[in-house]
Design a protein with these regions (language model features):
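Sequence/fold signature of self-assembling virion shell proteins
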Residues: 2-7, 14, 19, 33, ...
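Extended, solvent-exposed, turn-rich assembly/linker loops in the middle of proteins
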Residues: 129-203
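Short acidic, glycine/tyrosine-flanked loop/strand segments centered on an H-E-D-like triad
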Residues: 70-96
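Surface-exposed, low-hydrophobicity beta-strand/loop segments enriched in small/polar/acidic residues
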Residues: 23, 30-33, 39-55, 63, ...
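Short, Lys/Arg-rich flexible segments
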Residues: 2-21, 25, 95, 114-118, ...
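Near-N-terminal "mature-domain entry" segment
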Residues: 63-68, 108, 112
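Alpha-helical scaffold segments that mediate packing/assembly in large oligomeric complexes
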Residues: 89-163, 279-286
Length: 286
């Protein structure tokens, strides 16, 4: 999360230099990178919509068309995890630094910590469609390409329904490859793997995205569930919303003249929406 503080900030330079280094939080877990656009958070609850597909009818040209509105289903789930963060910020005058600037610092600090809590999210992610593979002698790149082909085929656009009144469903393509240490080591040996180096724009945006292969962003995690080699997914099948439930700034800190005390709580949660958009691969047993 970044902010244009140079235009909106009215405090002193010393305070600004203390706050700015923390506002560009690094996100580590892939759902944090790919927050669904149709998710809202209110308090400790996340709301999202399951949009239904268009109706498709077939018949002679010029026939009367009936309007059928299927609408969308609104659903919700609780954000049952939270992080609290707080501390003393020295040499910051409460009167000269607005609470939104302090709040942004707290939220971004909490963002970095929340993103490190991969285990809960990965456990939920691993509930996707179970797949097995036999490691190719030609390397991990071939395994990835085969897995992408399976994903795209199973998520291709399909017409469902009866007769001439059908609906189009699907159309999702694989966009992300989540790998653990073992499979990542194999992937690095493939010349098709494009590794991103520190300092590149992509790396700066999300430190967990380590490169690209086969048209997919490669996300590295050290906390892959046991037995899972890699996960091929489209982020639309998974939600990881975050929200701030409270932020407070206190003007006086005992024993620290000229300092303020700030604290905040961030709530978050994980939910698998479509198991078929998350393919979880384990090596086939010999």
């Amino acid at each position: 999360m970044t902010g244009n503080f140079y235009e909106n900030y009215n405090g002193d330079i010393l305070s600004l230099n203390y706050i700015l280094p923390t506002v560009d939080a690094k996100s580590v877990f892939i759902p944090g990178l790919t927050t669904a656009f149709d998710v809202t958070v209110a308090g400790q609850t996340a709301y999202y919509y399951e949009s239904e597909t268009f109706d498709i009818s077939k018949g002679p040209a010029g026939r009367k068309l009936d309007l059928a509105e299927t609408g969308a289903k609104r659903k919700s789930f609780d954000l049952d995890q939270s992080y609290g963060i707080g501390g003393v910020i020295p040499l910051v005058g409460h009167a000269t630094v607005s609470e939104d600037v302090i709040g942004r610092k707290l939220v971004d600090s909490a963002n970095g910590v929340v993103a490190l809590d991969n285990q809960i999210g990965l456990a939920e992610l691993a509930k996707g469609t179970a797949k097995t593979y036999t490691a190719s002698e030609d390397g991990a790149y071939v395994d990835v390409i085969d897995a992408v082909a399976v994903f795209n085929k199973e998520n291709a656009v399909k017409l469902v329904g009866e007769g001439d009144n059908k609906k189009a469903k699907g159309g999702w393509k694989a966009t992300t490859l989540v790998v653990g240490p073992e499979f990542y080591a194999k992937l690095q040996k493939c010349e098709e793997f494009s590794k991103w180096a520190p300092g590149q724009t992509q790396f700066s945006a999300n430190e967990a995205v380590v490169g690209r292969v086969g048209g997919l962003d490669v996300v590295y995690t050290t906390e892959m569930p046991e037995g899972v080699s890699f996960i091929v997914m489209n982020p639309n099948g998974f939600l990881a919303p975050k929200g701030v439930s409270a932020t407070e700034v206190f003007d006086k800190v005992e024993g620290r003249p000229g300092a303020i005390l700030a604290q905040s709580e961030m709530v978050y949660g994980f939910k698998l929406l479509d198991a078929n958009q998350v393919h979880v691969y384990k090596a086939a047993k010999a």
